[in-house]
Amino acid sequence: MSKTTTALYELIWWSFTLVLASLLLLPIFTKLPDFPFYLDNFAFVVVAITLTRYLFFLDISWLRDHLIIQASASILLIILIFWMIQSFNGFITFFDEEGPDILVKHLDKDTAGIMNTYMKTQYRFFGIWAIMAALLTPPRFLYNVWVRYRAGVRQI
């Protein structure tokens, strides 16, 4: 695969990821401006999609032959996993301490129920997906490093 094709492929995926993350957060942003977990939620969506992409499409990505970067990313993902678990726990603890409807009490009853369900479901779905993808990616990277090194790839 040529470098131009690889760069275009990467650009398209990043564009898709950022647009999807923005669209998923748009209902929360418009109805709940005081939502304290925007950054965490955005990071969960981006991490989930990006790491899942690398899990399944590593063989056709720019990262395939960059063994040192994969090994470094595997180590850095451990730190990211701890941060994501802490953020996820903070989200659950926030609603345990403040009450289940603290952020939607200013909305009418029907809209509040819908937004409360959407907000919690979306955050939990992408949070768990991101954590699982981050747990599976280091072994995938290390396996790829081993296979590519045995194939004679010695790039940084």
How would you label these PLM feature ranges?
Residues M1-L51:
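Transmembrane alpha-helical insertion/packing segments
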Residues K31, F91-F95, R148-I156:
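Transmembrane helix-loop junctions in multipass membrane proteins, especially transporters and channels
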Residues A43-I69:
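Canonical alpha-helical transmembrane segments
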Residues V46-R53, W129-F141:
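Hydrophobic cores of alpha-helical transmembrane segments in multi-pass inner/ER membrane proteins
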Residues I69-I92:
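Hydrophobic alpha-helical membrane-embedded segments
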Residues T111-P138:
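Hydrophobic alpha-helical transmembrane segments
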Residues A134-I156:
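Cytosolic juxtamembrane helix at the C-terminal end of the final transmembrane segment
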Residues I85-D108:
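Juxtamembrane non-transmembrane "cap" segments at the membrane-aqueous interface
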